[in-house]
Amino acid sequence: MASYSTNEFKGGLKILIDGNPMVIVENEFVKPGKGQAFNRVKLKNLLNDRVVEKTFKSGESVEAADVEELNAVYSYFDGDSYVFMHPETFEQYMVSQEALGETKKWLKDQDEYQIILFNGQPISIIAPNFVNLEIVETDPGLKGDTAGTGGKPATLSTGAVVRVPLFVQTGEIIKVDTRTSTYVSRVKD
């Protein structure tokens, strides 16, 4: 198995700590006036999204995580797992509801998502930054009603709820930022 020295640490590097795949979020090299240099590293656990801080002595090496990222198309839900298919190899990946997490509310048939595999098993799904979804339910916007916050809740075809401007109506397709769960714009046909 490959390993990385602390000299090679940088943001985005995937390493194995106590059997858990981690990604380096921040790396700070510290050389005190007295004593040995060290790296203060902020790590994000890929299995549960927890962020931890850890220090490594300069020159120490850690094992590389067997993490692979690939794009796959969402096909269908089969009762207990979501099925994604690689567009070129047609290999299917069964993804559990735990691994899917918050991405579930952005799932749309035949859209492409990024799958993160650890030892060949899907551990996380990343939705595209923006998705186009249909509004299935929202209150009608009353003309001249601008006294409030300037928005109203709208339920989308996937079940997600986002705040939209008053002029947006049921049946319209809108663009949503999946990172912040916010309305971006209406989609023109």
Swiss-Prot record:
InterPro entries: Elong-fact-P_C, NA-bd_OB-fold, Rib_uL2_dom2, Transl_elong_fac_P/YeiP, Transl_elong_KOW-like, Transl_elong_P/YeiP_cen, Transl_elong_P/YeiP_CS, Transl_elongation_fac_P. Belongs to the elongation factor P family. The keyword Cytoplasm applies. One of its GO terms (molecular function) is translation elongation factor activity. Pfam families: EFP, EFP_N, Elong-fact-P_C. One of its GO terms (biological process) is peptide biosynthetic process. Transmembrane segments: none annotated. May be beta-lysylated on the epsilon-amino group of Lys-34 by the combined action of EpmA and EpmB, and then hydroxylated on the C5 position of the same residue by EpmC (if this protein is present). Lysylation is critical for the stimulatory effect of EF-P on peptide-bond formation. The lysylation moiety may extend toward the peptidyltransferase center and stabilize the terminal 3-CCA end of the tRNA. Hydroxylation of the C5 position on Lys-34 may allow additional potential stabilizing hydrogen-bond interactions with the P-tRNA. One of its GO terms (cellular component) is cytoplasm. The modification N6-(3,6-diaminohexanoyl)-5-hydroxylysine is found at K34. SMART domains: EFP (SM01185), Elong-fact-P_C (SM00841). Keywords: Cytoplasm, Elongation factor, Hydroxylation, Protein biosynthesis. PROSITE patterns: EFP. Pathway: Protein biosynthesis; polypeptide chain elongation. This is Elongation factor P. Involved in peptide bond synthesis. Alleviates ribosome stalling that occurs when 3 or more consecutive Pro residues or the sequence PPG is present in a protein, possibly by augmenting the peptidyl transferase activity of the ribosome. Modification of Lys-34 is required for alleviation. NCBIfam families: efp, PRK00529.1. It is found in: Cytoplasm. It comes from Francisella philomiragia subsp. philomiragia (strain ATCC 25017 / CCUG 19701 / FSC 153 / O#319-036). PANTHER family: ELONGATION FACTOR P, ELONGATION FACTOR P (EF-P) FAMILY PROTEIN. Its main location: cytoplasm.
